[in-house]
Amino acid sequence: MVAAVLLGLSWLCSPLGALVLDFNNIRSSADLHGARKGSQCLSDTDCNTRKFCLQPRDEKPFCATCRGLRRRCQRDAMCCPGTLCVNDVCTTMEDATPILERQLDEQDGTHAEGTTGHPVQENQPKRKPSIKKSQGRKGQEGESCLRTFDCGPGLCCARHFWTKICKPVLLEGQVCSRRGHKDTAQAPEIFQRCDCGPGLLCRSQLTSNRQHARLRVCQKIEKL
């Protein structure tokens, strides 16, 4: 008799226990999904470090974890710190630098072809729109340029990160770089300097300090 009662109770409790387990599984999966989605956002600035604002088609935007190396991307903010979005793929800074520099050179070539009357290729990357200077006005220090002719007196057009800006021509005693000289492939010259001013030459310092001897500075040309 007792065995029959216990068997009946176990039969009644089994469905109830299964329902409790199913409910717990559903709740834990929902919590995990919510934690993975993160908080809602309007832009990347609303998210914490190593997160970006993901905007799905059928859902509200939310903060998602940044994407690692060689993952698909649409902008730099989607990639984790230390990487950039180049050609829709998260790429290291070292690998991205030569690619971006090559694109800049191609953009400069495209602009030159357009001014000489040759057709511009459609597959060339488009230059970001910039504020046009009034006709005849030369660029001031820090303003964007394409060539030194675009800059005012005492300035030259030199590379600064992934663009070109007007920078001051170097004076006597200022650190300089040999014209056309490039650093190693791991550290390309993305901060170009202007040439030395008139009557000056870029050459190594004459000093007993080995560390300072490696520096090249603008010096007066000695008359023979």
Curated annotation (Swiss-Prot):
Region DKK-type Cys-1: start-end pairs: 41-90
Coiled coil: none
Stretch list, region Disordered: 109-139
Signal sequence bounds: 1-18
Annotated localization: Secreted
Domain of life: Eukaryota
Keyword annotations of the record: Cleavage on pair of basic residues, Developmental protein, Disulfide bond, Secreted, Signal, Wnt signaling pathway
Family per record: Belongs to the dickkopf family.
Protein name: Dickkopf-related protein 4
Species per Swiss-Prot/TrEMBL record: Homo sapiens (Human)
